[in-house]
Amino acid sequence: MSAKEVKFGVDARDRMLRGVEILNNAVKVTLGPKGRNVVLDKSYGAPRITKDGVTVAKEIELEDKFENMGAQMVREVASKSADAAGDGTTTATVLAAAIVKEGAKSVAAGMNPMDLKRGIDLAVEAVVADLVRNSKKVTSNEEIAQVGTISSNGDTEIGKFLADAMKKVGNEGVITVEEAKSLETELEIVEGMQFDRGYISPYFVTNADKMRVEMEDAYVLINEKKLSQLNELLPLLEAVVQSGKPLVIIAEDVEGEALATLVVNRLRGGLKVAAVKAPGFGDRRKAMLQDIAILTGGQAISEDLGIKLENVTLAMLGRAKKVMIDKENTTIVSGAGKKADIEARVNQIKAQIEETTSDYDREKLQERLAKLAGGVAVIRVGGATEVEVKERKDRVDDAMHATRAAVEEGIVPGGGVALLRASEQLKRIKTANDDQKTGVEIVRKALSAPARQIAINAGEDGSIIVGKILEKEQYSYGFDSQTGEYVNLISKGIIDPTKVVRAAIQNAASVAALLITTEAMVAELPKKNAAAPAMPGGGMGGMDF
């Protein structure tokens, strides 16, 4: 075990505070509409330019072990805010640094760190309650666009794209952000349920120009096992031919005699048919097939349920207004499933999302939810250079998470004003002793830090701006740093999602309170490089001539 270095008390807190300050100074310059960019050097490829607080924070690693501990703890604040709300990472970092700085002074003055922490916790509870009380529900598409614009640093085009995407796929729909190959940013909506499996044989193609299978008002057979012989299916196929409707077969695989027979029938025109492999693997495949069954109003044919292929009737098949299959994807539009059944399935998946601890599982469940609930929107971000595309994609990601958060918990005035207004409520908090009161006061001072920093980044005097905002009692009155005017922020569209602001203060206070109560720090001593062994002497040792 290597030797350790231990620091105590003021010395430990000072070193830690220095690390917090370094990280905060790098991150805070990105805050607000007039925030600056940060350039990150990469070990390979071009440097990355970003205005995203958490991306900057994740790059910071300090040489001094004790300073680095402070920086890493605050980096955790940014990461947690990104996980919880997807935005507000810079605000959270600025708040944490402000609380740590004030808290360290109070501890140095001899106050009880545990009472300070209790005071901080009381203050945060009051702030969260105030935010929730003043939160305004998002009702219009315009407000969603405003949230997107603010979170993407004033880019109205991004705000508009996000509002359109949310309108088309609904609040539960999935919005994915990709890099485009062109200069333009574009939005593509995939309606209905799409999964990443294409046709098994190109002979099923109906539209030769686009190499695509297009079927209107089709039956859908959902089978969990492989199909290699068609004997069991003949009665069903005859019934489908009689109905004159096309048939889509989704199965683990279709091969051999079964595939050959289907292709021959398709080419002769007797049966309009196409076969697709089932999506996913293992238990996830079973779940996805069940989703398709519920969406199309059919039954998944599975031997687990005691249903055999020879007993399948037309009534057990799903129906869809349109099915499109290309080489890589299958899209089912307007399935005939009952609305109540689909809603029940959606609620079941939501419950699974709440319970799961795996990020991968959560992502897959959210994809399934979107496919059932609304559809998928893809925003392809364009730009002149790779560096520009990456920077813009960062902002679109932030804005996307912010718009979701706004729909979830509503909005409050932006520009750090919601926290400033909440700070006024803290004067009324009753505490058990003076040290707890100081803890509340630490948070009260820290709550002005984001508004102050936004003003500083816009080239204004932060203290004067904060003072003027607090003079007026109107809740949404604040400073528009883009134009340099005092306005009603909500009617001007300068708004923040309540969830983002709430997550920022909760995460900042949680980590900052722990840093304040730190009394000792332990870090590994740097290893001393052992001296290189001496080179052997010249000549041939041990040989006498």
UniProtKB/Swiss-Prot annotation:
Its EC number is 5.6.1.7. Transmembrane segments: none annotated. It is an enzyme of class 5 (isomerase). InterPro entries: Chaperonin_Cpn60_CS (IPR018370), Cpn60/GroEL (IPR001844), Cpn60/GroEL/TCP-1 (IPR002423), GroEL-like_apical_dom_sf (IPR027409), GROEL-like_equatorial_sf (IPR027413), TCP-1-like_intermed_sf (IPR027410). GO terms for biological process: protein refolding. GO terms for cellular component: cytoplasm. One of its GO terms (molecular function) is isomerase activity. It catalyses: ATP + H2O + a folded polypeptide = ADP + phosphate + an unfolded polypeptide. Keywords: ATP-binding, Chaperone, Cytoplasm, Isomerase, Nucleotide-binding. ATP binds at residues 30-33, 51, 87-91, 415, 496. Disulfide bonds: none annotated. It comes from the Bacteria. Gene3D superfamilies: GroEL, GroEL-like equatorial domain, TCP-1-like chaperonin intermediate domain. The keyword Glycoprotein does not apply. The keyword ATP-binding applies. It is found in: Cytoplasm. Together with its co-chaperonin GroES, plays an essential role in assisting protein folding. The GroEL-GroES system forms a nano-cage that allows encapsulation of the non-native substrate proteins and provides a physical environment optimized to promote and accelerate protein folding. Forms a cylinder of 14 subunits composed of two heptameric rings stacked back-to-back. Interacts with the co-chaperonin GroES. Belongs to the chaperonin (HSP60) family. This is Chaperonin GroEL 1. The gene is groEL1.
